[in-house]
Amino acid sequence: MYRAITMRVEPRSDQRRFLDESIRVHHYVYNAMITAVKLYFSYYGKLPSHNGLNRVCTQIWQNNPWMHRIYQNTMNQAAKRALDAFRSCNPGIKQVSRKKKDGNVAGALVLRSPRYKKLERSNTFGYISNKSFKVVDSVDNKGKNRRSLSLGKMKGSLRCYNQSTPIREEPKTVIISRKDLGTHCEYFATIQYE
């Protein structure tokens, strides 16, 4: 059974730029994945596999050098979210192809599409592999517990505010979210563990 703990994190200014850039790139990749699924479905008449969309994410990352500052494997979460959005909009469509008797795919199925996200509504990104992040628990000079979160390709570690709640097992994923409060933004990390 998966459990989750959410805690507020306090990034420095360079870390804040990294988190904002990661959210912006994930917004771009999510919208690109919606277009990729539409094109794949119009050509093959079925939804693509998750691994197929991950390969498209890799191609996007390789073709855009401005994305190389973020961790590439986190883009796979955007592909998974786009595929899940298509599956929730089209619950009757399986991943198998449905062609007409003459072999033509056109007109066999109608695909309902999720909406493209605006940048203002994109507020999360995630590390879906525990090899790309690390939760560090330590004790300071005064004997207090200190928890910090290190993310792949980000310099330094994020200070976590929820120090006392124990994480009993090995963390599996972490989702970073941003909440706009008008005058400033607050950042939260949700750590999922088994």
PLM regions: where:
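Nucleic-acid substrate recognition interfaces
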Residues: 1-194
